[in-house]
Amino acid sequence: MDKATGFNLTIDAIRLPYTKDVATYCAPFSCEDNDLDEFFATDAFLYDSELLGRTYAWVNAADPTQILGLVTLANDSVKAQFITSSARNRLQRSISNSKRGINYPAVLIGRLGVSTAYRNKGLNIGSQIIDFIKDWFRSSDNKTGCRFIVVDAYNNERTLKFYTKNGFKPLYKTETEEREFLGLDANDALETRFMFFDLKLR
């Protein structure tokens, strides 16, 4: 819940699997990001049909034709044996030595968008969606083990600030370190930063 406005995503919105029927019933969704808008308009349904990603919609309980936010989730893992030693130490810092391994189960936030109509109103919809995901995968109802939430966050100030505010950390401390790991030249754009959240931490 947002303390300032009293908006509570679990009360003031309804979570639904994002299907073509939901998309048809609701008003067109836009978060003013062309790539995200196109994904949610078309690709989200293809990912779902191929079991590659599942998208969820939060619609306004007072007006169910209005989509507040969308998120696409997929299974993933952090392959510790393939990352640099400094990044591996950063990742494993809170894991006991006896439980450290070469792979750690994770859930990937593939896409996350908040409707332009509901942004910048103090509702904190994006952060409340993140909180829902954290609680969902910590819950005893979760059918598989999952240690981390991971995201390839757009490498811009607003997006990085959002995920940092919600407890995510960059796997690589610097862009230079991440660029070197990815084999990018100095002039190549680093379009995303890999960030993680440890579900064992509160």
Model-predicted segments: where are they?
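Non-catalytic substrate-recognition and accessory regions of acyl/acetyltransferase enzymes
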Residues: 1-121, 127-128, 135-150, 160-202
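His/Cys-centered metal/cofactor-coordination and adjacent catalytic loops
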Residues: 153
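Negatively charged, flexible loop motifs adjacent to catalytic sites
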Residues: 156
